[in-house]
Design a protein with these regions (language model features):
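Bacterial N-terminal signal peptides
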Residues: 8-17
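Bacterial N-terminal signal peptides that target proteins for export
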Residues: 1-8
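Periplasmic c-type cytochrome electron-transfer domains
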Residues: 21-432
Length: 432
């Protein structure tokens, strides 16, 4: 349902800044040792962070725009393990099929995301009865089903500030066995909905869909809570998060009847007013998405633990080729007027993971493209109880062994390692 947003430019704008990477830590703050789990980065405004944190944990209700179909009622409901902002227990459900050899997300039945809950009859205004209807499970026509766990958000503000060129340079340096034939296969450029006109290298989400945390938040607000939003980004109207999701069922009734959204300029009076305000450049109105983005942007990375392998695990990590995608690069960026160094152990690129890929993509994607998954950062893995994109295991050895496609060589190296070598590697991972 509708929630009107006018993006606060200073908060929502993608804060990419000068930075880079190095093999050794410099004199900047080691971001992953400077705070406890769930704390803010050094230099963060404490009052703003507390307000944003409260908004992230706030339970939405119908009057806030919740629904009519949704998966949870707050950001914190899906991001709370260890501390607010962490991994969640929920597994998002995706589906689709292949039509003439390419992916079809079955948009006519609300695909490719299935929302688990619906508001049966909500009256948002006099004379309007919003009916979400009953979902069909599985959705008609679906032949591909996948689960995706909710990812932790610790340290993502630092990731947002990694320069595009740094990620592109990592991609260019990787061998074809890891990146495929073309570097362009790995990199997705996003012109964000809340940062219109700023095209950057995407780095968030299992499929690397978003480059900015504002878009990451706006996407979740719509697809996980059913709260539609519009934005005034650089004075332009952005409508991509302004359309209600369809219920996951077939036929003309799949359209959510009577549920107002912001998608029809000149017909929806509220939308027309928003369009006029956007033309006037109204950007200084606080909104939920800005708070969500501020909270994630200023969360410190998960603190590192003690490496009980005495350094042997990192050596084994590199020997087995894990560092091909989970790069050991130390990135250095500026935030809150300070310089931070951090090791997320990810190249923030997508790779063809073969049988491990979830098979979900955009309409028209080839099967190979649907197998591409973003390299999940390993920092904070010691706080997670679900591994791989669908949380199929909590066992690190099993997760390594399940790597396929462009990760198969590392899985093979792990399988052929001695018991002592494997133990050293697992001890190292348990320190991250």
């Amino acid at each position: 349902m509708k929630r009107t947003l006018f993006a606060l430019a200073a908060i929502l704008a993608l804060p990419l800044a000068a930075g880079g990477c190095s093999d050794l830590m410099d004199e900047s703050t080691a971001a992953d040792n400077s705070a406890a789990l769930g704390d803010a980065l050094a230099g963060t405004n404490a009052t703003q962070f507390a307000a944003a944190r409260a908004n992230f944990a706030l339970t939405e209700v119908q009057g806030d725009g919740l629904g009519p179909i949704f998966n949870e009622r707050s950001c914190g409901a899906c991001h709370a393990n260890g501390a607010l902002g962490g991994q969640g227990q929920q597994i998002e459900r995706r589906y689709g099929t292949l039509t003439n050899g390419v992916f079809n997300g079955l948009a006519n039945t609300g695909g490719s995301l299935r929302q688990l809950f619906g508001i049966g009859g909500f009256n948002p205004s006099p004379g309007v009865n919003c009916q979400s209807g009953t979902d069909a499970n599985p959705a008609p026509g679906a032949t591909i089903f996948a689960g995706r766990g909710t990812t932790p958000t610790f340290g993502l503000g630092l990731v947002e500030r990694i320069p595009d060129g740094t990620i592109q340079g990592i991609a260019a340096a990787q061998p074809a066995s890891i990146r495929g034939v073309a570097v362009t296969n790995q990199i997705h450029l996003s012109d964000g909905q809340f940062t219109r006109g700023q095209t950057h290298v995407s780095r968030f989400g299992w499929k690397n869909v978003h480059a900015s945390l504002a878009d990451f938040a706006g996407d979740a607000y719509l697809n996980e809570m059913g709260i539609t939003t519009t934005s005034c980004a650089a004075g332009a109207v952005v409508r991509d998060f302004a359309t209600e999701n369809r219920a996951n069922r077939a036929g003309t009734n799949a359209v959510i009847n009577g549920c107002p959204d912001d998608m029809v300029p000149g017909v929806d009076d509220d939308f027309a007013a928003e369009e006029n305000n956007c033309a006037g450049g109204l950007t200084e109105v606080q909104d939920d998405v800005a708070n969500f983005a501020f909270f994630m942007r200023n969360l410190a990375p998960a603190p590192r633990g003690i490496d009980n392998s005495n350094g042997r695990g990192l050596t084994e990590f590199n020997r087995e080729g894990c560092n091909g995608c989970h790069v050991t690069t130390t990135f250095t960026v500026s935030q809150n007027g300070r310089s931070f160094s951090f090791q997320p152990f990810s190249d923030f690129l997508v790779h063809d993971m073969g049988a491990l890929g979830d098979g979900i993509g955009n309409d028209g994607d080839s099967v190979a493209v649907t197998r591409r998954m973003r390299t999940q950062p390993l920092w904070g893995i010691r706080f997670r109880n679900g591994l791989l994109h669908d949380y199929r295991t909590s066992d690190k050895a099993t997760a390594i062994s399940q790597h396929a496609g462009q990760g198969a060589a590392a899985a093979s190296a792990f399988a052929s390692a001695t018991a002592a070598q494997r133990n050293d590697l697992l001890l190292f991972l348990s320190s991250l």
